[in-house]
Amino acid sequence: MARKFFVGGNFKMNGTRKDLKAIVDNLNNAQLDPNAEVVIAPPALYLDFVKQNLQKPNVEVAAQNVFNKPNGAFTGEISATQLLDLGVKWVILGHSERRNELGESDEFIASKTKYALDNGISVIWCCGESKDTRQAGETIKFVENQLAALAKEINDWKNVVIAYEPIWAIGTGLVATKEQAQEVHAAIRSWLKQNVSDKVAEETRILYGGSVNAKNCKDLAKEQDIDGFLVGGASLKPEFVDIINANL
């Protein structure tokens, strides 16, 4: 089965209404690959604003976080019910910035992923290694441990998109070579085959993230197990359109 090309744009803590309107207008006016699925993740307080201004049927909106409880005394958190109330059906979970800056563990991320999926929200689940882990030759083992923590919590993977983002490449200008990225993507798919099922391994989309731009996206997209991208800084720029159209 051919896996549909997927591009996510993680705006992180960037943009005002004026900035985001310009980004959305650029997407609305662009000729986008009709065979690409696109999801953009603005800051939480602009989710509805972005959603109201989007006019492309194949572009959806994602949250950058969701909590693992339905409601209650959890200051600053967002529930799945609240996201669904806005019509938001995607969320990014496990990003290294939340793992490292906010101390989110593999287990906590897995519990949030399960909660989102159980409530009908699809998940872009992030994994990836540090520079030290890469240099120690332990990248694949590290990523497999992250996958194992997730697999303990979830059984149904059909609404999970995996994003491999080597931490040393996020926002640094460094980028994994297409061979480095393909090696890890293939290892992730192999792990899914061995530990989940052939069907999940074949159907799950695995994205690459980490300093993706208009110059390197086409070569990366040609690799067998790279099914798209999770884009950070470049998603705020006009070149995001070129990344979406990497297969054209």
UniProtKB/Swiss-Prot annotation:
Positions of the catalytic residues: H95, E165
Gene Ontology biological-process entries: gluconeogenesis; glyceraldehyde-3-phosphate biosynthetic process; glycerol catabolic process; glycolytic process
Keyword entries, A-Z: Gluconeogenesis, Glycolysis, Isomerase
Residues annotated to bind substrate: N10, K12
InterPro entries: Aldolase_TIM, TIM_sf, TrioseP_Isoase_bac/euk, Triosephosphate_isomerase, Triosephosphate_isomerase_AS
GO cellular component, one term: cytosol
Pfam families: TIM (PF00121)
Self-association and partners: Homodimer.
This protein's name: Triosephosphate isomerase
Native source organism of the sequence: Neurospora crassa (strain ATCC 24698 / 74-OR23-1A / CBS 708.71 / DSM 1257 / FGSC 987)
Lineage: Eukaryota, Fungi, Dikarya, Ascomycota, Pezizomycotina
